[in-house]
């Protein structure tokens, strides 16, 4: 089990610091939702909720990794400056850069792995859910041989009715499936076991399904 208190530093200057770790709270709630989704009863309304919680859990995990890295390697004054830089990266870049930063250039993300591809897909779905909006779309109007006579629009009787077919695009909230959730959920829990748990508890980051050697 991952430690709740990730780091404590005691200094003789009257100031001491500790770093609290709430990752387990995220993963516990995610696991409860995961079990509901895997059940036989269809619950498609939970799918977008699951994707949102998965992305929140992943980003919290990445932020915790960066916080721990800065806490372990920099004095408090420098820690804040470095951490601000890392936390201001976009979500995908946080994922892409963390093994290179943590390992000081020895490890990189394995973009060929299905695990990383699933995490990239998760981020894309999350962005689609949380930042979705509608846009104007074009359609073709058939020629109805209309004319202007005495400042009035005149349409031939045979064209008084026209049929226009409007095609709708798939909405992200309806496109998420149970299989998507199960696949992405399994990857998130693998991230916990292979990366977050060993790094938080033992300060270790190793080659795994998500990470490969730079060379």
Where are each of the predicted segments found?
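Short, hydrophobic, well-ordered secondary-structure elements
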Residues: 44-69
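Charged alpha-helical initiation segments
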Residues: 1-48
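Amphipathic, Lys/Arg-enriched alpha-helical patches that create a basic surface
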Residues: 123-128, 141-215
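Flexible secondary-structure boundary motifs
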Residues: 63, 67-151, 164
């Amino acid at each position: 089990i991952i430690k709740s208190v990730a780091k404590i530093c005691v200094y003789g200057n009257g100031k001491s610091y500790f770093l609290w770790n709430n990752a387990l709270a995220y993963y516990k709630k995610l696991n409860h939702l995961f079990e509901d989704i895997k059940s036989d009863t269809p619950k498609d309304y939970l799918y977008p909720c699951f994707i949102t919680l998965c992305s929140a859990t992943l980003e919290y995990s990445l932020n915790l990794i960066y916080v721990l890295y800065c806490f372990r390697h920099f004095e408090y004054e420098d820690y804040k400056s470095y951490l601000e830089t890392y936390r201001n990266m976009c979500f995908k870049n946080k994922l892409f850069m963390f093994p290179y930063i943590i390992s000081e250039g020895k490890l990189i993300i394995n973009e060929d792995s299905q695990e990383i591809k699933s995490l990239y897909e998760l981020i894309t779905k999350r962005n689609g859910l949380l930042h979705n909006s509608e846009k104007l779309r074009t359609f073709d109007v058939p020629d109805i041989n209309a004319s202007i006579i005495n400042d009035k629009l005149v349409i031939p009787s045979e064209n008084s009715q026209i049929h226009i077919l409007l095609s709708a695009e798939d909405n992200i909230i309806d496109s998420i499936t149970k299989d998507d959730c199960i696949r992405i959920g399994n990857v998130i829990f693998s991230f916990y076991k292979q990366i977050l748990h060993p790094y938080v508890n033992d300060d270790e980051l190793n080659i795994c399904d998500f990470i490969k050697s730079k060379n």
